[in-house]
Design a protein with these regions (language model features):
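Serine/threonine-rich, low-complexity intrinsically disordered segments
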Residues: 16, 22-24, 175, 222, ...
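N-terminal regions of proteins, emphasizing targeting and processing segments when present
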Residues: 5-8, 393
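Short, composition-biased motifs enriched in small/polar/acidic residues
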Residues: 359-434
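Residue-level hotspots at or immediately adjacent to binding/recognition sites across diverse folds
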Residues: 41-362
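Short hydrophobic transmembrane-like helices used for membrane targeting/insertion
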Residues: 1-4, 18, 41
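Bacterial N-terminal signal peptides
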Residues: 28-40
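Bacterial N-terminal signal peptides that target proteins for export
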Residues: 8-29
């Protein structure tokens, strides 16, 4: 069994701190500024059974990844005359399903897709593939390698994962039909979990359990959680375009230790809320910093949850979910409209689902412009709303400084000057206030 299979077995066994109403999250590399903006959320949801691949009774389906067009990739099991059932990769788009023509891996990251419907795939033999424009291609491995796997991709089509090699498992990037070693420091095994549109990498390294890193513009940053003990471990699982990462940590090396979901937004990871019994795990996130996974409540009781605005939504027990006959939901990914995909039992059969809020976060665009004396932050306001801009040098700070009195919205562009500051990084939040 290879290390990635061991990681998947462990995951099968076993939020930002401020409540601000915002609508997006962006990072300015030039100024090293993080802007967190959230929009209104809704308590009403609709759940859709994505259906089967084929129509043989007893088939199952699962969903792994969703893009911002609402398209979903996952797997469906089909029966072939004279042979056992096979698990195929499926793309659900615009009310239709498409068999991508490759046997699926049972891995928790069987496939990922971007907004262009490029699909990165792990097949059943640990051979990475890419499906693009209707064509399926096998991705190359490092010299001397016999197997590898994908974990993520960005809007530019860069795919990340791992490849075997004579020197051990290496984190790699595929782009344009070539494979490149990320050059990460040595270890018994390492793999890249995600890459954002700026090229930032999220990497795990198997050493004393797992250690996690972000590689930003060639600089390696060790991801820490303040509550992790010296013999604890971290495991990053996803990354967004604001440079936020989500993952998990525990305080004991080993398969039996309790895992806890966390969010990295600069500095130490912030543990995400849990039930009193403790234990949780994150699987995916969107560009708003919202995270999906599960929260452990008791034996055989781990509801699917969506973490946002410092709290979590119990997806498994939404009235709409229960009324539709669903149970045992497992949430795997979330897009920027807070649409959640995964799988659960619908009327007793395993099915892929799409869970959509009735009201989605409202797009909220912010622009940063460098100037000789600092920068200007600007955004389009809504008439009747009031906005406040807060700032700090560290996202885990308890107190944030206001840049002035609340600003009344007028339906026009609001521009706020940000003076120069000696700090290497400064963070800002734009929020609506009463």
């Amino acid at each position: 069994m290879n290390p990635v299979e061991q990681l998947d077995e462990r995951r099968d066994q076993t939020p930002p701190p401020m409540k601000t109403r915002t609508a997006g999250s962006r990072l300015s590399a030039a100024l090293a500024l993080s802007l967190s903006l959230f929009g209104p959320v809704s308590a009403q949801w609709t759940i859709t059974d994505l259906g089967l691949l084929g129509d043989a009774d007893g088939n199952d389906s699962q969903a792994w990844s969703i893009n911002n067009r609402g398209h979903v990739v996952g797997s469906g099991r089909i029966l072939t005359p004279g042979s056992a059932a096979q698990l195929h990769v499926v793309l659900w788009a615009d009310g239709r399903q498409r068999d991508l023509g490759v046997n699926a891996s049972s891995s928790l990251t069987g496939a990922k897709l971007n907004d262009a419907d490029v699909v990165a795939i792990n097949d059943g033999t640990w051979k990475p593939h890419v499906w693009q424009h209707g064509l399926l291609s096998v991705l190359p491995l490092l010299p001397g390698a016999s197997y590898g796997g994908i974990h993520g991709l960005n809007s530019g089509g860069q795919i990340v994962g791992w490849s075997d090699s004579p020197a051990g498992g290496r984190s790699v990037i595929w782009h344009g039909g070539t494979v490149t070693d990320t050059g990460m420091m040595g270890g018994s095994f390492m793999w890249a979990m995600a890459i954002n549109d700026s090229g930032t990498l999220a990497i795990n390294r198997a050493v004393r359990g797992f250690n996690s890193y972000l590689v930003v513009a060639g600089t390696t940053n060790f991801l820490t959680v303040a509550s992790v003990t010296p013999d604890g471990t971290t495991s990053v699982v996803d990354l967004n375009n604001a440079g936020q990462a989500c993952g998990n940590f525990n305080n004991h090396v080993g398969q039996s230790a309790a895992w806890h979901a966390c969010l990295w937004t600069g500095g130490d990871g912030i543990p995400l809320p849990e039930f009193p019994s403790g234990g949780s795990e994150a699987f995916g996130m969107n560009n708003l910093g919202h995270v999906v996974g599960y929260a452990y409540r008791g034996p055989y009781d781990a509801p699917a949850v969506l973490w946002r605005d410092g709290a979590f939504v119990n997806l498994s027990e939404l009235p709409e979910v229960l009324a539709a006959g669903w149970s045992s939901l497992s949430a795997r990914d979330v897009n920027d409209s807070d649409q959640v995909v995964g799988h659960g039992y619908h009327n007793g059969k395993l099915r892929a689902f799409l869970l959509s809020p009735a009201t989605v976060p409202v797009p909220f665009h912010v622009t940063l412009r460098r100037e000789a004396t600092g920068a200007t932050l600007s955004f389009v306001s809504s008439a009747g709303a009031r906005y406040q801009v807060l700032t700090t040098t560290h996202l885990t700070a308890t107190n944030w400084d206001s840049l002035g009195d609340p600003i009344p919205g007028s339906g026009q562009v609001i521009a706020t000057h940000i003076p120069s500051s000696p700090e290497t990084a400064r963070f800002f939040v734009v929020r609506t206030v009463p």
